[in-house]
Amino acid sequence: MDQYNLNTREGRWKHFGSVDPIKGTKPTEKEKMTDLQSSKKDFLFEIDHVGIKNLTYPVRLDGYQTAGTFSLSTHLAKDEKGINMSRILESVEAHYDNGLSLDFDTLKTVLITLQTVMHQKDATVDVDAKWFFDRFSPVTNLRAIGHADTRFSMTVEGDTTVNKSLTLTAMVTTLCPCSKEISEYSAHNQRGIVTVKADFAPEGELPANFKERILEAMEVNASSMLYPILKRTDEKSVTERAYENPRFVEDLLRLIAADLVELDFVTGFTIECRNEESIHQHDAFARLSYNK
């Protein structure tokens, strides 16, 4: 058995099974390596989307730095074998500035870069990120940080945006109208999870507060909003407001839809409301889609 100097890192590595590299026969210089992805012949089908998913990358959203989860893809013509996937992250890195600014203008710039370096006709991105914002308690007006989940989605062809949407997911309180109606006192209530996918005119301008206006439609139509901090006077207000505004999932869905119809920058939407029922082991849900 070979003896190694265990006082050195290399010796310890070999003691634990590491071996010296072999002398290979394949080229080590990039220019001499075979580029399989760039092979050209009939590969039978073009591909709508090919790229990477679950890329975690720092983003900046409304003054907060958070982690974004990216899916980035391009089209692939049928006479091309594959894409150079390293160029995807290079396209993101080219726009890094203490994180990537999470807004549609920046995402469009990233996609145009990606599309150009890939020599493809379109590019698509989806970014999931936590959105943090100030939330004030209803009576004492104490500030704390609230949050919602966002997904920014966009596709470009050339210099033109062909679709653009925002998905927001937020939690609310819902109090059961049936429980209130049939009970001598009290009513069961629970958290509701509301998800809105709002579509926008691809090349249209959005107001600076477009996220806030969509979130407001989701929250104010519930029995109550959720708050990070509640003192006793706040808790009394929240409890009584919920009792005064009972909502089935069907009610909440329709009320949110009515508000979204009135937002002129929203061209269509899909809403889902899901209640984590406090008196059942299952959830209740409702969903609708609408195009203006």
From Swiss-Prot:
Its EC number is 3.5.4.16. InterPro entries: GTP_cyclohydrolase_FolE2 (IPR022838), GTP_cyclohydrolase_FolE2/MptA (IPR003801). One of its GO terms (biological process) is tetrahydrofolate biosynthetic process. It comes from the Bacteria. It holds the Pfam family GCHY-1. Transmembrane segments: none annotated. GO terms for molecular function: GTP cyclohydrolase I activity. The record marks C176 as: May be catalytically important. Pathway: Cofactor biosynthesis; 7,8-dihydroneopterin triphosphate biosynthesis; 7,8-dihydroneopterin triphosphate from GTP: step 1/1. It catalyses: GTP + H2O = 7,8-dihydroneopterin 3'-triphosphate + formate + H(+). Coiled coil: none annotated. It is an enzyme of class 3 (hydrolase). HAMAP family: GTP_cyclohydrol_B. Converts GTP to 7,8-dihydroneopterin triphosphate. Belongs to the GTP cyclohydrolase IV family. This is GTP cyclohydrolase FolE2. It comes from Macrococcus caseolyticus (strain JCSC5402).
